[in-house]
Amino acid sequence: MERRTQRERRETTERALLTATADLVVESGLGSVTLAEVGRRAGYSRGIVTHHFGSKQALVEALVSASQAGFVPGLDEMDPGLGRFLALVERYLGAVGGIGSLSRAFLVLWAESVASAELGPVFRERDALFRADIAADLEAGRAAGDVRADVEPAIVAAIVVAELRGLALQYLVAPDSIDPGAAGRALRAHWQAALGA
């Protein structure tokens, strides 16, 4: 059997710790997350959690970052513009139907961030980046002549983030109430008609 490198062992440990954190968040919210419980859940000591992340805040920030990485596959290979925007809208909701504990934890934490001094700044920054990415796609689409000149990218971006996150939360709360794939297709068709030049 081939020995794993230090880096591979570290990545395996971090993945296990993030998964344990996500599971706790999904089950009971942020209040249930302690470094000791994360370590126990992952099969490690509290000390290893502290060693890897330093604090609960850093652990939660790492969870938020990891949960968003690659959530909507294939977008990085696309050029900015209307096509990328429409793919995001459809694929984001399509991905919701198959999300794992990391992404579920992201949505739970996003909802909790409204009343949390710990989470508020993290999610304000994340949402600002998400809106900026969407607005950049719309601006590129406008420059290419694919998006109407009177469209306000920042306003549309705020609406779209609310739609995507709101529909995802609805699915998380009541999975039988919404078909995420169908919702994604409907939202794509709506925005294609609303934005088209």
Where are these regions (language model features)?
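Helix-turn-helix
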Residues: 12, 16, 20-58, 62
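Amphipathic alpha-helical packing segments from all-alpha helical-bundle domains
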Residues: 72, 98-101, 117-144, 155-158, ...
